Amino acid sequence: MKHLFILLSVVLSCFSMIAQTNNNHFVGMDLSMLTKYEEHNKPYLDKDGAEIKDLLEWIPSIGVNTVRVRLFVNPTEPNAKAPEGVCQDLDYVTRLGARIKAAGLNFMLDLHYSDSWADPTNQKLPASWNDCVTVDQKAEKVYNYTSEVLNTLAKASAAPDLVQVGNEISYGIIGINVHPYDNAADNWDGFVKVLENGCKAVRENCPNAKIIIHTERSGNAEQTLYFYNKLSNLDYDIIGLSYYPFWHGYMDKLEETLTTLGNSFPNKEVQIVETAYYNSWFPSSGATYNTSTTWEASDAGQKAFIDQLVETLAKYPKVNGLCYWFPEEAGCGDDTDWNATNTATVIQNWINRGLWWPEPDAKGHWPTSALYSLGKYSTSALDNINVDFSDNRQKYNLSGQRISNPNRREVYIQNGIKKIGL
């Protein structure tokens, strides 16, 4: 009896032109601190307890095909291991980006245009840009800086596949203020001009990359719509959202925003470029919503959140990306001395949203259950291609075509099982 299997449209790191395929799901991790954890931490383990030799080489096996890395202009502590993780200068990002590309992964570059964190409350001009006073000067600086960064990365075989022009820019960028609602003091003309120059630099210097405009109002559909309506003439590809339920609300709020964006911007893709949830110790302060009553701060609760998020996003055809923020976190990074000074750690304080547990007495760090749930997003879009897998010896690519010998790192199907060529 012949068995028919539905071939899932899985997009993994083996495709060199992954960013140009229409039905891709980008399954991502923001691994901006990976280098520091590799230098100052025990190895990462898989669910069977085996040591992961190279995390970038391993993550395609669980369905991850994209890695996001932030870039600061002149980070405040480029050589420090603490306290904030603000160490990603161009040299750091170039070296990590080259590793990402060599592993066959998509590289998402997150341009902060700042010396430190750029977010809704901080969009400061880099100190070395203080001579840029007018909008025209700032726009020109963004164009030149973006071009320089992309050329440097390209020369190092680290050209990004996706580029964020700004990070969580709902309220402005490099000191030019706007709001996602009516405010008489806003400078939307100046704001858009700066973005235009950043996007222009990407198109000219990295023409195959997709451009992301990233905000964090995912829990407010009205404000999100207001913001992106202001960018109606901007040349970009993807609406990028941060979604942290403890700040942005429950899944129904996100769904309202996704529905609004899908109806209002049918020509734009949508991605959740940042999300995370607690695996322990829900904070006693700082959270807008006590979501621990829905998803407890535990291994099971973190997994339940990711499972529900993957299921939710699969309902929206314009949504094609999900990226987990800081999954490489495993405590502060020094597990030989829990009382070590800050200079001996990767970060100063535990955030407790990583996808590995800090295990001081183990041979390495064990993964949380949510790690393996994240990769499910890669299989949540179905092409419904019927393929005859009755002959166990035959191999098939992800288009349903029979192949003889898969290339190295090529994903293929044999006997109904997804495998990767060696």
Locate each region found by the language model:
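Bacterial Sec-dependent N-terminal signal peptides
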Residues: 1-21, 381-382
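Boundary/entry segment of secreted carbohydrate-active catalytic domains
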Residues: 20-58
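Hydrophobic faces of well-ordered beta-strands that scaffold small-molecule active sites
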Residues: 25-31, 67-69, 107-111, 161-165, ...
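Glycoside hydrolase catalytic-domain groove-lining segments
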Residues: 52-56, 189, 204-210, 219-291, ...
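Substrate-binding cleft and catalytic face of glycoside hydrolase catalytic domains
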Residues: 58-210, 214-216
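Aromatic-rich peripheral "rim/lid" segments of glycoside hydrolase catalytic domains that contact
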Residues: 260, 280-291, 296-308, 312, ...
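Residue-level detector of functionally pivotal "anchor" positions at catalytic/ligand-binding pockets or at interdomain
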Residues: 379-402
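C-terminal tail/sorting-segment detector
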Residues: 411-422
